[in-house]
Amino acid sequence: MTRIENIEIFFIEYPFPKNLNYQYSGGLVENMIVGLIKITDSDGEYGLGEVTHAQFTHKPIIGLVEHFKNILIGLEIGKINNAWEKMYGSSVFWNREGIAIGVMGGINIAMYDLLGKKLELPVYQLIGGLVKEKIKIYASNGLFESSEDLIKDANKAYDMGFRIYKMRIIKPDTIVNLVKDFKKEFANRMELIVDAVQGSTANPWANKVSINLAKELEKYKILFFEEPCRVENIEGYKEIKKSTTLNIAGAESIPTARAFKPYLQSEVFDIVQFDIAT
C-alpha cells in the first residue's frame, strides 16, 4: 500500500454579488470560501477532502494542516482510523471540539477519497455499502423577511428540480405567516423545512419561543424543525422534543461520536445532521 507523501490546503473563494445581503445568526457573510485538503501518495495520486467554515478560520486551518501533516507523512493510506487516532492523540489536550476536529475530518475524507481511487471503489463501499438507491435532496436558502422574496426564490429552486425547500428564520414573529404563504403557493408540489438557526446564534431565544413556534407549525406539516435551541442545550432539546409532534433535527456542529452520545441516549433528535468536517 502506498504512503502519504504530502498534505496541502487550498482555498477557493466565491464573493457574493453586492446586491446579495446574506445575513445569518453570526452576522453578514460576504463570500463563501471552501477549504480543500489534498493528500498525495507516493505514486502521485491524490484525494480531496473539505474543511467547512474556511471563510471564518482561514489562517488557523493552514497551521493545523501543517501540524497534522508532520504527524501523518509516511503513513500507509489505508490506515484511516490509525491516522485519526494519531491526530487526536497529538492534540487531545487542546482539541476535543472546534476547528481542529474539522481539519481532522477533512483529512479523513481525503484519505477515503484517495483509498477509493486506489481500489477503484466508491467511498460508500468502503464504509459499509449501499443503503438506498436514491435519496431526496433539498434546496437550502430561505433567509427572507417577505413572502414575495421567499416564494420567488423557492420557485427558482422548483424550476431547478428541487421538491424540498429549507427556509431559515430571521424573526420568530414572522415565520408562521411566511410558512402559511409558502404552503398556499406550493401546496403539495414542494415540501418545506424550517431552520430556526439557534444552534450557533450568539443570543438564542428562550425555549418557550421555539416551543410555541413548533406548536404553531405543526398544522403545516413541515418535514422537520431544525436547531430550535443552542446545540449544547440538551435540556432545552428534551423540553422541545416533548412538547411537539414535529420532527426535530440538529447536531450539525457536534463534532464527534463521543460528543453526540448523550444526545443519542436522550433521543432528542428525529433527524441527525452530522457534518463530519465541522
Predicted segments, located by residue:
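Metal- or metallocofactor-binding catalytic centers and their adjacent structured scaffolds
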Residues: T40-K118
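Structured beta-strand/loop patches that form or line metal/cofactor-binding pockets in enzymes
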Residues: M1-L48, T52-H53
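Metal-dependent enolase-superfamily TIM-barrel catalytic cores that perform enediolate-based chemistry
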Residues: G128-T244
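Active-site flanking residues adjacent to catalytic metal/cofactor-binding acidic residues
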Residues: G49, V194, E226, A251, ...
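Catalytic alpha/beta core domains of metabolic enzymes, predominantly
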Residues: V231-T278
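Conserved, mostly hydrophobic/aromatic
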Residues: I4, I37, G44, F68, ...
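Glycine-rich, aromatic-flanked loop segments that form ligand/cofactor-binding clefts
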Residues: I99, N108-F144
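Active-site phosphate/pyrophosphate- and oxyanion-stabilizing loops and adjacent acidic/basic residues
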Residues: D113, Q125, K180, K238, ...
